[in-house]
Each structure stands twice: as C-alpha cells, then as structure tokens.
Amino acid sequence: MRSIPTSVVTLLLVSSMVSGCVSDPTKVDTEEDNPVEVDPDYEPNISEHCTDYDELERCWLLLVPLILNESAPAPLLVDMHGNGDDMYQQRWTSDFANISMEQGFFVAYPQGHNNAWNHGSSLIPCSDELRCSEEDDVGFILQMLDTIMQNHSVDKSRVYVTGWSNGCGMTQRLAVQASEVFAAAGCMAMYRFAEVQSDYSPIPFMEVHGLLDEIVLYATTAPAAPVFGPEKGAIQNLESWADLNGCQGSIPEVIVSEEDYDIRGYTDCENEAQVMLVSLFFAAHNPYEHDDPVADPGRGWANPTGVPSSTIVWEFVSQFSKKSNESIIM
C-alpha cells in the first residue's frame, strides 16, 4: 500500500464555498435523423443531434473538423460542461474545438439534464437550491457514443473523455464505470465521488486544478461536505486514483515545473496507465484560457497566465489507446 507524507498534503491551500452558475436550460428540438446546423457563429461542421433516452430528449453537439478524412478512423473526445453551463458554452470555453480543427479528431459536447450531470455524489437529493441531476447519464453518454460511431468513422480504441467542474465529476464517473470504453480521461476542477465498478480496468487519468479555486477547494472539500460527500482535495484525489490504478511509488514525481504551474503524478501503474495532477498556481475555478460566458462573479475568469490547460490534457490523453476495439454496446 502506498502512503503519502503528511508534509505533502499540508503544502496545500485555498478558500471557499460551493456554488453553481444558473442559466436557462438549453432548448433543443432537433431529431437525430435530421441534424441541423448550430448558430451561424459556429463553424458549419458543428451539428446538433438528439435522441430519446429514459423518457427524456437528450442532445449533443458534434464537431467534425474540416481537416478530418473520414476514410480513416479518427479519435473522439467527449467534452462535458459544468453545472449551470450548457453544451454551447462548453464548446466556446474549453477550446478543444480549436485543437480538434488543428489535429483532426471528433468532439462531442453532450447536454446535461437541467444543465447538470449525475456525477455520483448522492448524499442529498436535488432541489431548487441544489441544481444537480439524478438521471442515468452514464447510459445516455454510452448511447450517444454508439450513435456517433454508427454514423462516423471513429477509432474505437481512442475514445477519450473530459469536462469541467460537475462535468469533471462526470468524467471520473465514466472513467471508473465504463473503463472498457475510454482509453484515457482528463478533466478540470472536480474530484471523484462515484463508486468504482467491480470490473474496472485501470486507465490513464489527469486532473487540472487551480490553487485558488474558490468553489471546489484545492486543499479540501470539507466546507462543502454536505454537497460533495467525504472530504477530498486535489492531492487526495491524485492519491485515490494512484491507489485505484495500482501505481508504484510513495510520493508523486514532479514531471513538469514552471513558474505558473506544475505537473506531478505516477507513471508506473497497472495497464501502463498514468495518473497526473496539473496544479495552476494563479487560477481559480476556471482553468481554461477562455472566460466562461455565464461568468458569475469569480467563477468565469480564465486562468490569468494563459496556461494551455486544454492542450496539456489533450497531449496527455491522446498518447493512449485501447488494445481492443470491442463494441461499446451493452
């Protein structure tokens, strides 16, 4: 069993409270058989799709970059918005769209029910005061992937998942409850609360977190325990994933050290997996290079030194692939 010195944990800091931005739920009424173009401000290669799942209409945006040659299978990244945002805002904020148009991979932006995801923290029920989701979001995402794969040339060995805040919690739920589907996961500003499936097989994981995060504290979630559940922090989350992936080493090694961020983690893990934490020294809850359009005070500001967090995540996840291309159909 690995153990981490108390001195490592006590290096951490930060302040604050739980909150979520509120915006009107996304109104979508398109049919899967007839995908429509999104708003003219978007590239013409982004389309909106919907399907019925669990008696609800569930929708997503799909970016097929113009440089993609669909005669050959290409990777697919699932990118999930945070609580109170929607798929349109995530497409703008995360910047994975620009990366995909340079490097040639699909990006799917699913829409959470009531602008939220069921990321697996269910100690208290959803309410008007606490916007969250109690839907089968794992099942919805898998159905969305199956639909995309039926209509596009996706490399099933290179399906990745990312997200921000509540979407990062959902990323980690998918990683531990559908590890047979995803080659790697990397996300922003949230910890893992979902239960791990008995058939979990270690996959690479990276989390990006601002040291000054005022919503999901870097050091601990103790002030928000009624919402988030058992106490977590960025280092605890890293260590939890290292245990889960059977990583060797008593403390994380420093992989990259810069003036405004560092990357530390474990590289010797089961299944050739890795576990990484990217700490942004001057960032708050939004670690991206773009401001969040919802922009509640303090929540929407981008990381002030321009750390290319999305590029870091993509370069990490995209180096991994599954050894098997089995169908995701359950």
Residue ranges and their predicted role:
Residues 1-25:
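Hydrophobic alpha-helical segments
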Residues 21-22, 26-76, 102, 106, ...:
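A domain-start/cap signature at the N-terminus of enzymes
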Residues 78-80, 188, 280:
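Alpha/beta-hydrolase
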Residues 127-132, 220-230, 296-304:
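Active-site rim elements
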Residues 213-216, 285-287:
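Acidic catalytic loop of the alpha/beta-hydrolase fold
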Residues 51-61, 71-160, 164, 170-173, ...:
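Serine-hydrolase catalytic machinery in alpha/beta-hydrolase-like enzymes
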Residues 55, 203, 242-330:
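Alpha/beta-hydrolase-fold serine-hydrolase catalytic core, especially in secreted/extracellular enzymes
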Residues 207-209, 213:
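Short beta-strand/loop motif that positions the catalytic acidic residue
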